[in-house]
Amino acid sequence: MGQSTHPEDLLISAMIDKEPEVRLEHCFASIQDIFKRALNKDRRLLAFLSSYGARYMKKGLIQVAYDYDVTIQYREQAPSSIDDVVVDDGDWDASTLIKKGTPRELTLVTSYYDRVSEKLSEIMCILLSSCEGVHGFDTVCFVFENLSSDTVCTISYDYILPQQKLRQLQGQSAFAAKTVWKSILGKSKVPQFVKPFLAFSYLTQECCFDQRAYDEMENDRSSQPTDPVPYLAYGPLIERRGISAGFAWAFKALMDEANIECSCVAGCLREDTKIYHIWNLVKIDGQFYHVDPTWGIKENGVCISTFMQPDSMMRGTHLWYEEKYPAAKGLRFDYDYIEDFLAENGNEFLDDGANETYFFPDEIID
């Protein structure tokens, strides 16, 4: 590599390639100032640096210059490429961390660390409703105050159990969803708009709310749960128990198996704003509807007050960042519409092996 006009340019090139040693010749500034200039020209390099040292040789009598033999230690957890580092000038969009339901780890160089923390808090609901099994963010930050005013933030994720085990349980849940639909439908072929009710009816009748898991979360919201099962689709679909997260993911698994667009929503209940509550948005015939399977679980029947509801009705009991989710304006396919359809056509489905328990629950509660 040839000598660059400016020593900081040669240093930048060496650091991009993660070279452990570099020689800087004919320098008129201290090695610290050269590092400062390099990090000012390419702020992303701060994410690579662990430490540095330099031996020097003084040259010249009238105009003193230095030759530096620089050694550089790089962070073991540094990104593999400089292109994987994001620079934040105050306008970083935290929602880019979550793409297609998969959380993306990120190394961020920023002068706005306080804003970063605020932005991560603001999208916590999106994280919880997009990524099954994620408990929260894990952020590690460091600075080199003598070299840069920037902070390096490495953003990763806490999972409620090891990711390999999580994937295993998710695979079992997907298989269980197939089995559940067979037990509900038999050989009958029902319209898509009926299936959200059948999934809702199944979950609310066959599963129980795990009060112990809820009490643990209520007492210590920041710690990892001792029992992750109620937080996953695996809980309701296989062990038939869960809290709101588990029921929402289970409902989504059933909708995925039925090829119906469905997502989770993280917010809270108006009656208890301290704890996250998770439910679903389901899309039927181009319109979104809210479905809260947890709310439907009652000892004396199936409660349909939060089944296939628009935003305007859901606001009475639930709170969520509405701007972060699709607007639910659907009105047509509410419970009354589905009930009328099943009253007229249900016997045909029963003749094909459909399970009467889920098509016609003994007790419906408004």
Language model: regions and residue ranges:
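Short, charged/polar, Gly/Pro-enriched secondary-structure boundary elements
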Residues: A78-S81, Q163-K165, G286-H290
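Hydrophobic/aromatic-rich core segments of domains that either
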Residues: A245-R315
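A short, highly charged nucleic-acid-interacting micro-segment common to nuclease
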Residues: A233-F247
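Intrinsically disordered, low-complexity N-terminal segments that are enriched in acidic
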Residues: M1-S156
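Solvent-exposed residues in well-ordered beta-strands and their adjoining turns
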Residues: D158-I160, K283
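Low-complexity, Gly/Ser/Thr/Pro-rich intrinsically disordered linker/tail segments
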Residues: D33, R75-G90, V302-D366
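Alpha-helix capping and helix-loop boundary segments enriched in small/acidic/polar residues
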Residues: Q168, I238-G242, E271
